[in-house]
Amino acid sequence: LSKYFTVAYIPLYTDISFIPGVLNLTYVQNSGAAFSSFEGQQWLFALIFLFFTGLIVWEYFKKKMAFTPFERWCIAAIYGGGLANMVDRLRMGYVVDMIETAFMDFPVFNVADCFITCGCVLLMGHLVLFNKAFWKDKKK
């Protein structure tokens, strides 16, 4: 929904102050990955997305890896954000970005990017802090 409303109501490259001094809404078309790297490589991103989807399915079904509910939520956030961006890439050739930090110089991003980042950080933190199998393998 955030991408739809951005495209429908904010002209391209226009800044709208959302929370003055904190957040702006800025419609940007990003044909690359993070920080606009690898611009125009939509099929590379599709292959990477499919690879990680396959990896998750492999871990879950073939290795009988049991994910905790928290880990499933993290994986769902990562996968959902990736899927949302992938749909944009394949449908339009770019990802709609709209969130700009006004208080620091940082690339414009979108809600899906937030889900991917939060899911990754929380999953890694959870695995390091609470996954006994992670530490058991490292002690050998």
Which residues fall in each region the model found?
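Alpha-helical transmembrane bundles and membrane-interface segments of multipass inner-membrane proteins
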Residues: 1-140
